[in-house]
C-alpha cells in the first residue's frame, strides 16, 4: 500500500493532527510535521501500541480449564459354576488445559522468584566473604602491632646490654660506640618488624582466601541441590504420560481387587465344601474332573504363566531414520500399531499401518507417547566422505570463468571463434550451437575460460547451468536485431545467479546497426550502461572484423579484478559437470569445469549418481594432460556411467566409500522417481478421467550428449496440447541399440536419433517391425516434424459452406410427395445430394434433406442459378410462398498446431 501523510491519516481516522503526532511519539515513531509520510509498517506499529495501551491484547478467556470425560462399558466375567456375569466398568479421565499467557506469567513469576533467591544468596555470599576479609585484616593488623612492640622492646633491651658490655673494656670510646650500637639495634629492630608484618599479612590473605573458597563451595553445593529439586519438580509436572499410566494402572489394579473380592464372596455364600478334600488338590490331580462349558477341560492353575504387568510405562530410546513406516515405529516403541494410529489421529493425521511417515512426524508421535527420540540421518556416510578433504592451503587468484549468452544467431560462437582464432560455428549443424563448449584462452593479461551456451529456446536448462558455474556473463546482443526473447532469458539467468553482466553489442560494422537502441531496450530490464549511471559495461564489437575484441577482453579482466576471484589450488579437486556423453570407444565421458583444487589422473571422483577413477584427462583440444587446476575445463574418462549435466564432481579418498555413496544416491533417486509417479493427487483426478480421450505421440530419443537429451525432451513435452500429448517413452545418451528399438516397437513410438545412428542389431529390429526411425542434426527440424506428426493425430474440423439458394414462388400438391415447392434458384447451385435449410423471414424453421428435385417433370441432380425447379422436402409439408431454401455442404478441414 502507498504511503500517506500524517494529515491525510488523521483525516481518515477522524482525529486531530496534534493528537496523532503525540500518539506517534508515544509509540516510538519520530513524526514532527503534518506533511511527514507514514508507511504501512509504521501504521501497524501505531495500531499495536494503541491496542496495548487500551488493553486490546487481553483475551477474555479463563486461564485454566479442566475437561472431564466419562466412558462406561460392560465386560463379561466368568464366575463360579461356568456362568458369565456382566460387570459395569466406568473410566473417568480428566485433562487440564492452561492458557499459554497464564503459563508464561507463572513461568515469568517463577523465574523472577528464582532470580531474587539467587541474588540474595549471591549477596549473602559476598557479605560473608567481605566480613571474613575484614576480620582477617584486623587480626593481622593487631598481630603486626603486637609484634612491632615486642621487637622494639627486645631491641631496646639488647641495645642496653651491648652498651653496658662496651662500657666495661673501653670507657674512652664510650660515646661513639654507644651511637653505633644504637644505630645497629635500630636497624635490626626495623628488619624484624618488617619480616613479622609480611608474615602476618601473608597469613591473613591465606585465611581470607580459604574462607572465600569455603563460602563459594557452599553456594555451589546449594545451587546444585536447588537446581536438582527444581528439575525434579518440573519433570514430575511435565511427564504427563508417566503419571497418566500410573493412575491407569492403579485404577485397573483396584478394579481387579474388587472383582476378586466379589467372586470370593459369592463362592462363600453357596456353602462350605466337603471336609477332607481341597478343590485345588483335586483339580491338580485330575484335570478332567473340572469341566467348563460344553465339556471342555479347563487349564490347570499350575500351567498358567506368572506374567505381571509392568507398574510404570517403559521409556525407550527410539532410533528414527529419515522415513519409517507406522508398523516399524510401533515395533521400536514395543506397542501395538493401533496405539500409534490412535495417537496420530488425535494429532490430526490419518495413517495406515503400512504408510511411510517422515522423520518429523515420527518424532512428534514418539515424544507424545513418552519416549526419547534419537534421529539418524541416512546420508551420514555421504557427509563424512565429502567432509574428509584436505583443503588447508590458502586461496590464490584464479582465472575468471566467462559465459557467452544471448539470442540465437546473434554471433556468440563467432565472437568466441575470433577470440580463439578457430572455426567452430561452421562445425555446428545448421550454424547454431547445440552444446555447451568450454574453452580457455591465454591473453597478455592472463587466462580466461569461456563457456559458449546455445541461444535456441529449447536449451533453457543448458543456459541456466552455464550461468550457475560462471563468474561473469557476456551478453551478446546484435546491434541490428536488438533485444530478443532469449536475451531477456539470459538476463534473468544472470540475475538469478547474481553474476555481473558485460554487454557486447555485436555486428557493429553493419550499416543498419543501432547501438543506442540496444541500450534503451536493455534499460527496460534494469541493465543500465555505465554512461547512463549504471554498473554494466557496454562494449561495441564485431566478430567479423575483430573490432573491439581487445576492449571486450580488457573489460572482462577489469570485472574479474573487481570480483577478486580466488580458489584453493592445492588439495582435492571440486568442480561441476558441464556436459556428458557416451563414446563408443572410450565409454562415459564428462566435461568437468574444475572450480577449486587440482584434478589429477588417478583421482577417485564422485560425480552425482556415478563414481570412478580418472583413467585419462584431455583438454578442449583433445590433448592428454595429467592435471588441471581451477577454472580449467577438462574431459575425464573412467566413470561408471554418464552423469547428469550440472552434477557436482568431487574427489574423494576411498573408492569403496564412493561406490556406497553413489549406490545410496541411486536408490534415493529411484525412490523419489517412483513416489512422483505413484502420487495421485485430487487435482489430477479429472485429467486422469479424460486421459483415454487424448491422443498420444510416443517418442524414444537418443542423442550424443546429455544436454541435448534434456533440451529435446523439454521442447517436445512443451508441444503437448489438450488433444495430443507427446510422451517420452525413453531417452538416453549414445547410439540407438537393439533395446531402444524393442522399446519403440512395444510402445508404438517414433525413434529419434540426434547426431547418433543405429547399430546393426537395432537396424534388424527396425526393419522387422517397420518402425519409424528419423535422424536429425538440427533441433529446428526435429521439433517441426514432431509437430506435423501431432497435427495428423488431431481430430478434423468440419465447416458448413452454403452452395445455393432457391426462392419459393408457388406451392403444389403432389399425391406422391405432398407439398412441392416451385422455386427459382437465385444464388449458386442446388444439388440433390446435399442437405437443406428452410428459411422463413430469414429464420431457420426446418433442417433436413431433399426428397425430389425436378425440372419440367424430369429428375435432375442439380439446378444452376437463374433456372426454375420443383423441390420436395423430405418429411416436411409446411412450405409456403416466399420461403427460401438454402442448400449447404459439410467440408472437412485438417487442423494444425
From Swiss-Prot:
Alphabetized, the UniProt keywords read: Cytoplasm, GTP-binding, Initiation factor, Nucleotide-binding, Protein biosynthesis
Q: Where is this region: G3?
A: 452-455
Q: Where in the cell is it found?
A: Cytoplasm
Q: Which residues hold GTP?
A: 406-413, 452-456, 506-509
What SUPFAM superfamilies does this protein map onto?
Answer: Initiation factor IF2/eIF5b, domain 3, P-loop containing nucleoside triphosphate hydrolases, Putative DNA-binding domain, Translation proteins
Chain spans, region G2:
431-435
**GO CC: one term?**
cytosol
Primary place of residence?
cytoplasm
The ranges of region (Disordered) come to 69-88, 95-304
Which Pfam families does this one have? Answer: EF-G_D2, GTP_EFTU, GTP_EFTU_D2, IF-2, IF2_assoc, IF2_N
**Basic residues bias locations:** 287-296
Show the coiled coil region(s): none
The ranges of region (G4) come to 506-509
Q: Where is the tr-type G domain?
A: 397-566
Q: Where is the composition biased (Low complexity)?
A: 162-179
Instruction: Enumerate the residue ranges of region (G5).
Output: 542-544
Task: Tell me the PANTHER family matching this sequence.
Answer: TR-TYPE G DOMAIN-CONTAINING PROTEIN, TRANSLATION INITIATION FACTOR IF-2-RELATED
Q: What does this protein do?
A: One of the essential components for the initiation of protein synthesis. Protects formylmethionyl-tRNA from spontaneous hydrolysis and promotes its binding to the 30S ribosomal subunits. Also involved in the hydrolysis of GTP during the formation of the 70S ribosomal complex.
Q: What is this protein called?
A: Translation initiation factor IF-2
Whose protein is this, by species?
Aeromonas hydrophila subsp. hydrophila (strain ATCC 7966 / DSM 30187 / BCRC 13018 / CCUG 14551 / JCM 1027 / KCTC 2358 / NCIMB 9240 / NCTC 8049)
